[in-house]
Amino acid sequence: MEVANATQQKHFVLVHGAGHGAWCWYKLKSLLESSRHKVTAIDLATSGVNPKRLDEVDTLQDYCLPLLELMAAIPQDDKVIVVGHSYGGFCIALAMDLYPKKISIGVFIGSIMPDSTHPPIYFFNQYYEWNPDGDDSPDTKVETYGCPDQPRTVIHFGPIYLSTKLYQNCTSEEIELAKVLVRPVTLFSEDLSKLKAFSEEGYGSVKRGYIICSEDKAFPVGLQHWLVDNVGVSEVKEIKGADHMPMISKPQELCQCLVEIAEKVV
């Protein structure tokens, strides 16, 4: 891949999806860095090697705190490209809303992408309308914890779900890696139901890009196209043959998409 010169160098901030962590970007991070770009891959709360437990994180903002702390530390004159995968779309939207002047574009990969008109729960519900089975699988376990009057839901992705819905185009070794590293998740649906729409002057002022995964069995391809058509983006790419985890199954193609998008933003 062509090496970026000093004026072309970009800073990519990679934000994983539910249950995953910074580890899932290992191929893409190496490719972008070999092109002389700066890359920061973070672990959100309760994810990867982050020490937080599920019972210590109550809200979307709590979950996104590592990302928000990173954004707060970025110098005012710097701009980054935030990249969100799957549920991570909510996280980069929050960062775009709070730090619009520090972000040149937000890129959504097979991801929820809100607008500045509807509350976040609207897009959470759209996912289940397009995908009524949701995360159901013979080996996916759903449990509740916390106070009986305000129970929390936690989802454990099983190996069958991982191998058939998320990683179906990945190698057996990559699937085994996911089985070892993926952590239980909560989706903060109760908190999402209380949140207002992201602001037009914040989130709505930042450019958006979308990368469609053409063989995604976890986040419906039809919903990805619907989001592009109804929310609106300045850049759209599609990766043929990509499952829900293109950073692992199609890293070269994903890298090329991100570099091409980056070249078009200041």
UniProtKB/Swiss-Prot annotation:
Pathway linked to the protein: Alkaloid biosynthesis
EC id: 3.1.1.123
Family: Belongs to the AB hydrolase superfamily.
Keyword Cell wall biogenesis/degradation: no
Organism (species): Strychnos nux-vomica (Poison nut)
UniProt key word Hydrolase: yes
Active-site residues, as the UniProt record annotates them: S86, D216, H244
Expression by tissue: Mainly expressed in roots.
Designated name of the protein: Norfluorocurarine synthase 2
